[in-house]
C-alpha cells in the first residue's frame, strides 16, 4: 500500500471531511526541497479524494513573516528592511508588488506546471481580513498559559516581556523590534513600544502577527486544518509541532492535524537545500530541465521520512529511465506491474501536464542531431516513429533537454555532428572503413529503417553468412571477416562525430535521413586525409 493511501486511510478513520494544508515562507528562491512538502500534500489530498473523502488542498504563503537578514542574493541596501513583513519589502526586480510576490509568483506557476492546484491563501490578507483576530485575543488573554506550555515542552525560559503577538510599528514598519505594552480586547487593539523610539496603537486585524509557535496552532484552529506535512526540523523533540499540539488543544480547543514529517532533499554533494544559504535549485529552474511528472515521481516513490538524493547531472538520466520504464509497463499493462508500482505511477501523473512519449535520452540525441532547430526536431521525431500531433509537449521536452545539456549534462552526453568527414576517421582500420562502405550499400537497398533495425543490422556483421558480413568480405577480400561490433560502432561515431563513442546507436542512426548516412559512410570508407586537405 502506498504511503499516501496509508495516511488517507488513517485520517478517514477519524472523519470524512479534511483540509490538507501546506505553507512556505517566500523569503527566497522556493527550491525543490520545498517542493517535497507540496507534492506530499497533493499526494495525500489525491489519496483522500480517491477514497471518497470531502477534501480540500490549501497553500498558505507566510508572506507576513519578517525579512530575517540580508540574504547572500540581496544587495546591502536591504539592510533597512530587515524586520519588516516580506509582503511590505520592495521587490528585488521591481516588477512585482513586493518581495514575497517576487518569489511566490514563479513558485505558484511551477505548482500549476506540476499539476497541483491548491487554494492559495496569503497570510497578510488573512490577518488584515480579521481571520486571526479572535485567535489573537485568546492568545493575549492566555499569555501566561501559553508561556507555561512553551517552557514545559521546549525546555526554554520565556522572557518576562514576551508576548504571543508581534505588533507592526507604525513608524519603521518592523515587527521584530516591538514589544506589547498593553491591549484592549473589546476595542481589538494592541499598544506597543518599538526599539526605533516610536510607540503607538495598532488594530489586531493586520497590525501585526502572532509569533510562529502560536501562529501555527492558531491557523490549525482558524482554518480547521486536519492534515499537514512539515520538515523534520519542526518535528524535533520540543519543536514547534510539539508545542503547537498542546497550544491548539489547551488554548484553542481544537485537535492538531495529522502530521506528515518529511526528510530533506539533498542536492548532489552540496547537502540539504536552503534558500537562505544559497544551496538551492528552484522548482522553476528545475522544471526547465526535468519533465513535471519525473519531478513528481522523485517525491512520490519515496516515503516522506526518508531523505532523497537528487543530482541533476548524470544521475538524472537514471531517474528518468526508471520513471519511463514504469510508464511503459503501465501503458503495456505489463503483468509484472504490482499494485504498489501502479499507484506510484498514478500519483506521479497529473491532469494538465505533458506526458511525452519520447524517451528523454532519445530526445537528447534528437536535439543534438537537429542542432537545436525545432523544425528539424519535429522531422526527426516523426522519422523515429513518434506522433508530432502534440507539438506543445514535444517543444517542452526539447526545451528540457536544451537546458539540461547547457547546465548539467556530463561531457559524455554531449556531441556535435561534423559537417564534413572528421579527421579522426583516418585512425580507423581497413576493416572498419570496409564496414562503413558495406553498411552504406546495405541500407541503400532497404526502405525505412527503425532504430532497433539499425542496431540489429550492425550486430549482424559478426554473423557468418549475413548480408552485411558478405559485403564486408567482398571489400576486404577475405572469405569470412572476423568482426567485433564494438569496433563497428566506434567507426560509426568516429565518421559522424569525430569521437569513438556516442549515444545509443539505434536512436542515433534513426535520427538522420538515410541519404546523409549513405553519403557520409561512403566518404568515410575511402577517407584519405592528404586528399581531403
From Swiss-Prot:
<dbReference type="GO" id="GO:0000049">
    <property type="term" value="F:tRNA binding"/>
</dbReference>
<dbReference type="InterPro" id="IPR002904">
    <property type="entry name" value="Lys-tRNA-ligase"/>
</dbReference>
<dbReference type="GO" id="GO:0006430">
    <property type="term" value="P:lysyl-tRNA aminoacylation"/>
</dbReference>
<protein>
    <recommendedName>
        <fullName>Lysine--tRNA ligase 1</fullName>
        <ecNumber>6.1.1.6</ecNumber>
    </recommendedName>
</protein>
<dbReference type="InterPro" id="IPR020751">
    <property type="entry name" value="aa-tRNA-synth_I_codon-bd_sub2"/>
</dbReference>
<keyword id="KW-0067">ATP-binding</keyword>
<feature type="short sequence motif" description="'KMSKS' region">
    <location>
        <begin position="272"/>
        <end position="276"/>
    </location>
</feature>
<keyword id="KW-0436">Ligase</keyword>
<dbReference type="InterPro" id="IPR042078">
    <property type="entry name" value="Lys-tRNA-ligase_SC_fold"/>
</dbReference>
<keyword id="KW-0648">Protein biosynthesis</keyword>
<comment type="similarity">
    <text>Belongs to the class-I aminoacyl-tRNA synthetase family.</text>
</comment>
<dbReference type="InterPro" id="IPR001412">
    <property type="entry name" value="aa-tRNA-synth_I_CS"/>
</dbReference>
<keyword id="KW-0030">Aminoacyl-tRNA synthetase</keyword>
<dbReference type="InterPro" id="IPR014729">
    <property type="entry name" value="Rossmann-like_a/b/a_fold"/>
</dbReference>
<dbReference type="Pfam" id="PF01921">
    <property type="entry name" value="tRNA-synt_1f"/>
</dbReference>
<keyword id="KW-0547">Nucleotide-binding</keyword>
<dbReference type="GO" id="GO:0005737">
    <property type="term" value="C:cytoplasm"/>
</dbReference>
<dbReference type="InterPro" id="IPR008925">
    <property type="entry name" value="aa_tRNA-synth_I_cd-bd_sf"/>
</dbReference>
<feature type="short sequence motif" description="'HIGH' region">
    <location>
        <begin position="26"/>
        <end position="34"/>
    </location>
</feature>
<keyword id="KW-0963">Cytoplasm</keyword>
<dbReference type="GO" id="GO:0004824">
    <property type="term" value="F:lysine-tRNA ligase activity"/>
</dbReference>
<dbReference type="GO" id="GO:0005524">
    <property type="term" value="F:ATP binding"/>
</dbReference>
Amino acid at each position: 500500500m502506498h504511503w499516501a493511501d496509508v495516511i488517507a486511510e488513517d485520517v478517514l478513520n477519524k472523519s470524512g471531511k479534511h483540509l490538507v494544508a501546506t505553507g512556505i515562507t517566500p523569503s527566497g528562491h522556493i527550491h525543490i526541497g520545498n517542493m517535497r512538502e507540496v507534492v506530499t500534500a497533493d499526494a495525500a489530498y489525491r489519496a483522500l479524494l480517491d477514497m471518497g473523502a470531502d477534501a480540500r488542498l490549501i497553500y498558505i504563503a507566510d508572506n507576513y513573516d519578517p525579512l530575517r537578514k540580508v540574504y547572500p542574493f540581496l544587495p546591502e541596501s536591504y539592510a533597512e528592511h530587515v524586520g519588516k513583513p516580506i509582503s511590505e519589502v520592495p521587490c528585488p526586480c521591481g516588477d512585482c508588488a513586493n518581495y514575497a510576490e517576487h518569489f511566490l509568483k514563479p513558485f505558484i506557476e511551477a505548482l500549476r506546471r506540476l499539476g497541483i492546484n491548491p487554494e492559495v491563501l496569503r497570510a497578510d490578507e488573512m490577518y488584515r481580513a480579521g481571520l486571526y483576530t479572535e485567535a489573537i485575543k485568546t492568545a493575549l488573554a492566555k499569555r501566561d498559559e501559553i508561556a507555561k506550555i512553551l517552557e514545559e515542552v521546549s525546555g526554554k525560559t520565556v522572557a518576562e516581556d514576551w508576548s504571543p503577538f508581534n505588533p507592526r510599528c507604525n513608524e519603521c514598519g518592523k515587527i521584530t523590534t516591538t514589544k506589547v505594552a498593553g491591549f484592549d480586547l473589546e476595542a481589538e487593539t494592541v499598544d506597543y513600544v518599538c526599539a526605533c523610539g516610536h510607540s503607538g496603537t495598532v488594530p489586531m486585524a493586520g497590525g501585526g502577527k502572532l509569533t510562529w509557535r502560536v501562529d501555527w496552532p492558531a491557523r490549525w484552529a482558524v482554518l480547521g486544518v486536519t492534515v499537514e506535512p512539515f520538515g523534520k526540523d519542526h518535528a524535533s523533540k520540543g519543536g514547534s509541532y510539539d508545542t503547537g499540539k498542546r497550544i491548539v488543544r489547551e488554548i484553542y480547543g481544537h485537535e492538531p492535524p495529522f502530521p506528515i514529517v518529511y526528510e530533506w532533499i539533498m542536492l548532489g554533494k552540496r547537502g540539504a537545500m536552503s534558500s537562505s544559504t544559497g544551496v538551492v535549485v528552484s522548482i522553476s529552474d528545475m522544471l526547465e530541465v526535468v519533465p513535471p511528472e519525473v519531478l513528481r515521481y522523485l517525491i512520490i516513490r519515496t516515503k516522506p521520512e526518508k531523505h532523497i538524493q537528487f543530482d541533476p547531472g548524470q544521475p538524472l538520466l537514471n531517474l528518468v529511465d526508471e520513471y519511463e520504464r514504469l510508464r511503459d509497463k503501465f501503458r503495456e499493462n505489463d503483468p509484472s506491474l504490482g499494485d504498489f508500482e501502479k499507484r506510484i505511477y498514478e500519483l506521479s501523473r497529473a491532469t494538465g501536464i505533458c506526458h511525452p512519449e519520447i524517451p528523454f535520452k532519445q530526445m537528447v540525441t534528437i536535439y543534438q542531431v537537429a542542432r537545436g532547430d525545432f523544425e528539424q526536431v519535429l522531422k526527426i521525431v516523426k522519422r523515429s516513429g513518434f506522433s508530432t500531433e502534440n507539438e506543445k509537449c514535444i517543444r517542452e521536452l526539447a526545451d528540457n533537454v536544451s537546458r539540461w545539456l547547457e547546465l548539467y549534462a556530463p561531457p559524455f552526453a554531449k556531441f556535435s555532428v561534423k559537417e564534413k568527414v572528421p579527421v579522426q576517421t583516418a585512425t580507423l582500420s581497413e576493416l572498419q572503413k570496409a564496414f562503413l562502405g558495406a553498411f552504406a550499400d546495405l541500407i541503400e537497398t532497404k526502405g525505412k529503417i527503425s532504430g532497433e533495425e539499425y542496431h540489429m543490422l550492425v550486430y549482424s556483421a559478426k554473423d557468418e553468412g549475413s548480408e552485411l558480413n558478405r559485403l564486408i568480405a567482398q571489400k576486404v577480400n577475405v572469405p569470412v571477416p572476423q568482426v567485433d561490433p564494438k569496433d563497428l560502432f566506434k567507426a560509426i561515431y568516429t565518421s559522424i562525430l569525430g569521437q569513438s563513442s556516442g549515444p545509443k546507436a539505434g536512436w542515433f542512426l534513426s535520427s538522420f535521413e538515410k541519404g546523409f548516412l549513405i553519403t557520409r559512410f561512403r566518404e568515410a570508407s575511402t577517407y584519405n586525409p592528404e586528399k581531403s586537405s
